[in-house]
UniProtKB/Swiss-Prot annotation:
Keywords: Cell membrane, Cell projection, Cilium, Cilium biogenesis/degradation, Membrane, Transmembrane, Transmembrane helix. The keyword Cell membrane applies. One of its GO terms (biological process) is cilium assembly. Transmembrane component of the tectonic-like complex, a complex localized at the transition zone of primary cilia and acting as a barrier that prevents diffusion of transmembrane proteins between the cilia and plasma membranes. Required for ciliogenesis and sonic hedgehog/SHH signaling. The gene is Tmem17b. InterPro entries: Uncharacterised_TM-17 (IPR019184). One of its GO terms (cellular component) is ciliary membrane. This is Transmembrane protein 17B. The chain crosses the membrane at residues 50-70, 83-103, 115-135, 147-167. It is a multi-pass membrane protein. Belongs to the TMEM17 family.
């Protein structure tokens, strides 16, 4: 549901007044007109950004608890599970850093390729890996591990959902801007 146009205009004017740096020299009229263009809607997703933010702060705690629990149960694990869990820890650490960067860049800068990369890494790699660690009882899941895995799985699940919605919204917005530019070019040719 969209806001009525007068309220939307007033909120836009208010946000420009509050968030535009007024301390520097005044820009030229052209810069001002380009910067304050009324037709530019923000399509980044606040729920996705909040999930990414809290995930970024939770991940070091998850990583430390995972390393401590892996050290405690290492001698009781089968050899192939030792290799699998260490590999999963390394892969998840690398993927998480890349994934959080792509998610932030794609969402805040409204870049579709970065957001699509974030969503694919989340859905195809992180989600199955965390579910493997959460539900495979052969890896001797400890209570602390189960707790932090559940929290991380909830973050990842929320990011899959919010990322899909944000990606769909961003693609539709980009597509409509493309068609409007194309239509504007046709109108200029006619005149």
């Amino acid at each position: 549901m969209d806001l009525p146009e007068p309220i939307r205009r007033r909120l836009g004017d208010f946000s420009r007044t509050v968030f535009v740096d007024q301390s520097r020299t005044q820009p030229s009229f052209e810069e001002h007109a380009n910067f304050l263009d009324q037709n530019k809607d923000v399509v980044s997703s606040l729920p996705l950004q909040m999930s990414l933010y809290f995930n970024m702060w939770f991940f070091p705690f998850w990583w430390i608890s995972e390393v401590v629990m892996l050290d405690l149960k290492y001698s009781a694990l089968a050899d192939y599970y030792k290799f699998i869990l260490i590999t999963i820890l390394i892969v998840m650490t690398l993927i998480e850093a890349i994934r959080l960067y792509l998610g932030n860049a794609g969402n805040l800068q409204e870049k579709v390729p970065e957001l699509a990369g974030f969503w694919l890494l989340t859905f195809l790699l992180q989600f199955p890996l965390i579910l493997f660690q959460l539900f495979n009882e052969a890896v001797l899941v400890q209570p602390l591990e189960r707790g932090v895995h559940i929290i991380l799985a909830l973050f990842i699940f929320a990011e899959v959902l919010f990322g899909f919605v944000a990606l769909r919204t961003m693609v539709r917005h980009t597509e409509s801007r493309f068609h409007l530019r194309q239509f504007h070019g046709i109108q200029e040719l006619r005149t």
